[in-house]
Amino acid sequence: MKIFLICPVRNATDEQKQVMQDHITGLEKAGITVYYPARDTNQSDPTGYQICSDNLKGIIDADEVHIFYDPKSTGSLFDLGMTFALKKLLRIVNEIEPTEGKSFSNMILDWEKRG
């Protein structure tokens, strides 16, 4: 099984990085291949185009996509859109609080429930 992890990269906090690393370690110990953009995508890209292209390939190749959602991560929103367009199964890694009305938080929670 292959999993792509949507997550903050540039502005991820140390605490977020630790939660993501613990999640990745658990999956990899279980024999699951994890594509982790901070590790597996070359982040030296002056425009971000190649990063988005590499992440798209990782998402296409994944059996399912996991998300560590941080609403401040704009790159995560781009990856989320690609994942949605490809109709991939989505699993949430961290706690997401529902909001009143329409929001990405509510959409992600709904998406995961739909399986």
Feature names for model-found ranges:
Residues M1-G115:
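Conserved catalytic or regulatory cores that recognize and/or transform ribose-phosphate-containing ligands
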